[in-house]
From Swiss-Prot:
Entry protein name: Isoflavone reductase homolog 1
Single GO MF annotation: oxidoreductase activity
Species of the source: Pseudotsuga menziesii (Douglas-fir)
The organism's place on the tree of life at top rank: Eukaryota
Enzyme class: oxidoreductase
Localisation per UniProt entry: Cytoplasm
Key words, A-Z: Cytoplasm, NADP, Oxidoreductase
Keyword Cell wall biogenesis/degradation included in the entry's annotation: no
EC number of this enzyme: 1.3.1.-
GO cellular component term, pick one: cytoplasm
Keyword ATP-binding recorded: no
Signal sequence extent: none
Chief localization: cytoplasm
Similarity comment text for this entry: Belongs to the NmrA-type oxidoreductase family. Isoflavone reductase subfamily.
Length: 15
């Protein structure tokens, strides 16, 4: 998966 930074810079989501 690729780690993408969402609106909150401290939150990472695997897309």
């Amino acid at each position: 998966g690729v780690y993408v930074i969402e609106e909150d810079v401290a939150t990472y989501t695997i897309k």
